[in-house]
Amino acid sequence: MSAKTAVLLMAYGTPNRIDEVEQYYINVRGGRMPTPEQVENLSARYRAVGGHTPLTTLTKSVTDQLQAQLDAEFPDQYQVYFGMKYWHPLIPDVVKQIHADGISKVIGLALAPHYSKISIGGYQKQVDRANEEFNTNIELTMINSWQEQPKFRNLIANRISEALAQFPADVRDQVTVLFSAHSLPQRVLAWGDPYPDELLGSAKGIAEMLELPDWRFTYQSQGETGEPWLGPDVLDTLAELAAEGKKYVLQVPFGFVCDHLEILYDIDIEGKHKANELGLQLERIRLLNDDPAFVDLLKTVVTGQ
């Protein structure tokens, strides 16, 4: 067996072409067939952003950069892989590859800063199931949350400062900063899930760092499952801000690290359309994507284990 430790970066996944949307949707739904209307609705969203998102490409770039940064500081100690929850390369296939490469110790790191049993816990379940199904004997150390890392909060704070400069200097103190993260079903509250508290805690910490005069927290991109989801929803919050007489909004989707559909469609198209209807100027921060400073943050998270 190799003495190296595998680092398994994990993300949600995204189809690469429109004709892959249906199978991707089936994967997201745990094997249940979506209706033709649901497939068309999701396909239309992908068409609106150019047919695909850069999530896979960016995750590959982060993987390669993290490998280089780790090799420079810790030669021959780590091998970095990436796997996706709902599209290729699928996490179980990557677990098999890690085993085939003779590596038994794995650090699992989902590319999402805040823990929830549904989100981060779901990634761990995929590794555990693959480990059991393929008898790979992987020893997994899962990093559940890294939102308290000072480097993460500093990166988001810097992105906010950069984005506030998009507004005229005489209105910057009138900008409402709207932190957002992916909504989850309300049933997580019954579990005592830490997700809402982690989100509010990191939003408050970043807002205090910057001494933001007006900031809110909201959820976005809730699913269509027929059950209640965590709120308030960002579109409702935009309407409330307009009713309060606000004019300028900066959205900070700090629950995400990479450009994908929830950013490129839900904010850049749907959110901006709603804001325009309400007479609001809506801007957003640049996501971390494959910024070398973000990769440096991940190196800190990984080597701290």
From Swiss-Prot:
Gene source species: Herpetosiphon aurantiacus (strain ATCC 23779 / DSM 785 / 114-95)
BP term (GO), one: heme biosynthetic process
SUPFAM superfamilies recorded: Chelatase
PANTHER family documented for this protein: FERROCHELATASE, FERROCHELATASE, MITOCHONDRIAL
Enzyme Commission number: 4.98.1.1
GO molecular function, one term: metal ion binding
Family of the protein in this entry: Belongs to the ferrochelatase family.
Top-level taxon: Bacteria
Function field: Catalyzes the ferrous insertion into protoporphyrin IX.
InterPro entries assigned to the protein according to its UniProt record, in alphabetical order: Ferrochelatase (IPR001015), Ferrochelatase_AS (IPR019772), Ferrochelatase_C (IPR033644), Ferrochelatase_N (IPR033659)
Cell compartment(s), UniProt: Cytoplasm
One Gene Ontology term, aspect cellular component: cytoplasm
Swiss-Prot/TrEMBL catalytic activity: heme b + 2 H(+) = protoporphyrin IX + Fe(2+)
Gene: hemH
Protein name in the entry: Ferrochelatase
Protein keywords: Cytoplasm, Heme biosynthesis, Iron, Lyase, Metal-binding, Porphyrin biosynthesis
Coiled-coil spans in chain: none
Lineage: Bacteria, Bacillati, Chloroflexota, Chloroflexia, Herpetosiphonales
Binding site for Fe cation: 182, 262
Record HAMAP family: Ferrochelatase (MF_00323)
EC class: lyase
Pathways involved: Porphyrin-containing compound metabolism; protoheme biosynthesis; protoheme from protoporphyrin-IX: step 1/1
